[in-house]
Curated annotation (Swiss-Prot):
It is found in: Plastid, Chloroplast. Its main location: plastid. Usually encoded in the trnK tRNA gene intron. Probably assists in splicing its own and other chloroplast group II introns. This is Maturase K. GO terms for molecular function: RNA binding. Keywords: Chloroplast, mRNA processing, Plastid, RNA-binding, tRNA processing.
């Protein structure tokens, strides 16, 4: 965030509504060039090998304006109007430039609001993905019903652009944005296919996430407004965007400006114990009361998406279940409320009573099947979880191969240390350990047993299981009982700011 300060101060002197001139500033594409597009834990971080040119960027923008949009033939899609340039490379550069420019006014607004609220010091911890789990542990054990909701995608990207126009009044900027989407993102059909939108989101992640976050922000602002008006106790917590990789937004009282127009309480939504959590395109709605009120909110969401955002959604896609009988998936974990029953013997004078006490506990466990599926997709094991070698890494040195596998294990241990049961995590580590051994044996053209016997690498590979204990020993006292207790308990880290392939809720 510090790298934006210099450029944001330059934009502060200008009117925030006029973003079009910033598209032609060279420092914008300097940031776009250095931005890292790949955040997967399975590959190395890397930048572009090509050289970019601001002059080429300006030429491409000029050619977009010179195209004749009144004549559209069937062969237009096969023609490349940018001959001599790497179209895919420059589309990502321009897309990144659009995202950086449009983030500027909102980032300035966020910075000023954080300074006024005096929460700058705690802002980093609030941005952590793991910050949601203490909230779940504190609140969800007292709730009875949960609704697992998938936020539908807009049928056309034009809907996302129109939502952004309510906030930024710059006609030339949006005209250029539409031209870019038309040329680079196959926007020449009335209803884009789901595959084309998925391709655009993967090739232009920053711009797509910004537009999508704005769509979710609009829907959540209306939801929080009705929630605040539905009960006399106002919400004091934040409405949060947990995927703050590219778009930073954490606002308090999003709909405070509408309070003057609606001075009465909506009685049909009255529910003081309703809780809402969202990550990416998935949200969890939980309540303590009967499912009748949950059904009210369910149909409210459906009508809101269909009537206000022109997004089709069906009631059968939103299920309402009991927390004690249903597990929900969020942030790469499976969570459910477990009932612990205990019997207490009580004696009063000559009478003895047996009292059964039922307590609730939120179980957060590692989803072993999705993790194995992710490892199989990355070619570390097969679909059954049997480890296989990684031949594409065989050209590296032994140290680099081991370091790559250890880096993946560190990321997994760091993220999944909040699990109630560590057995599944140890199984994933075991798969990676054997995959590392098989990769080294494949490189040296030997069997696994012969390689271990010859090189004595078994002690080195024990780091897969001992490294996390060494990290904990630096934080907590070196007492065996204390370390054993922390291995059994959950540990949430407040420095996890980025998501990866393993925690995407597909």
């Amino acid at each position: 965030m510090k790298e934006y300060r210099v450029y944001l101060e330059r934009a502060r002197s200008r009117q925030q509504d006029f973003l079009y001139p910033l598209i032609f500033r060279e420092y914008i594409y300097g940031l776009a060039y250095s931005h890292n597009f790949n955040r997967s834990i399975f590959v190395e971080n890397g930048g572009y090998d090509n050289k970019y040119s601001l002059l080429n960027v300006k030429r491409l923008i000029t050619r977009m304006y010179q195209q004749n949009h009144l004549i559209i033939s069937a062969n237009d899609s096969n023609k490349n109007p940018f001959l001599g340039y790497n179209k895919n490379f420059y589309s990502q550069i321009i897309s990144e430039g659009f995202a950086i420019v449009v983030e500027i006014p909102f980032f300035l607004q966020l910075s000023s609001s954080l300074e006024e609220a005096e929460i700058i010091k705690s802002y980093k911890n609030l941005r952590s993905i793991h910050s949601v789990f203490p909230f779940l542990e504190d609140k969800f054990t007292y709730l009875n019903y949960v609704s697992d909701i998938r936020i539908p995608y807009p049928i056309h990207l034009e809907i996302l652009v129109q939502i952004l126009r309510y906030w930024v009044k710059d006609v030339p900027f949006f005209h250029l944005l539409r031209l870019f989407l038309y040329h680079f993102c196959n926007w020449n059909c009335f209803i884009p296919t789901k595959k084309s939108i998925s391709t655009f989101s993967k090739s232009n992640p920053r711009l797509f996430l910004f537009l999508y976050n704005f769509y979710v922000c609009e829907y959540e602002s209306i939801f929080l407004f009705l929630r605040n008006k539905s009960y006399h106790l106002r919400l004091k917590s934040f409405s949060v965007f947990f995927e703050r990789i590219f778009f930073y937004a954490k606002r308090e009282h999003l709909v405070e400006v509408f309070s003057k127009d609606f001075s009465y309480t909506l009685p049909f939504f009255k529910d003081p114990n309703i809780h809402y959590v969202r990550y990416q395109g998935k949200c969890i709605l939980a309540s303590k009361n009967v499912p009748f009120l949950m059904n009210k909110w369910k149909y409210y969401f459906i009508h809101l998406w269909q009537c206000f955002f022109d997004v089709w959604s069906q009631p059968r896609t939103i299920n309402i279940n009991q927390l004690s009988e249903h597990s929900f998936q969020l942030l790469g974990y499976f969570s459910n409320v477990r009932l612990n029953r205990s019997v207490v013997r009580s004696q009063m004078l000559q009478n003895t009573f047996l009292i059964e006490i039922v307590s609730k506990k939120l179980d957060i466990i590692v989803p072993i099947i999705p993790l194995i599926r992710s490892l199989a997709k990355a070619k570390f094991c097969n679909v059954l979880g049997h480890p296989i070698s990684k031949p594409v890494w065989a050209d590296s040195s032994d140290f680099d191969i081991i370091e790559r596998f250890l880096r993946i294990c560190r990321n997994l241990s760091h993220y999944y240390n909040g699990s109630s049961k560590k057995k599944s995590l140890y199984r994933i580590k075991y798969i990676l350990r054997l995959s590392c051994i098989k990769t080294l044996a494949c490189k040296h053209k030997s069997t696994v047993r012969a390689f271990l016997k010859r090189s004595g690498s078994e002690e080195l590979l024990e780091e897969f299981f001992t490294e996390e204990e060494e990290i904990l020993s630096l934080i907590f006292p070196r007492d065996s009982f204390t370390l054993h207790r922390f291995h059994r308990n959950r540990i949430w880290y407040l420095d996890i700011l980025f998501n990866n392939d393993l925690v995407n809720d597909e």
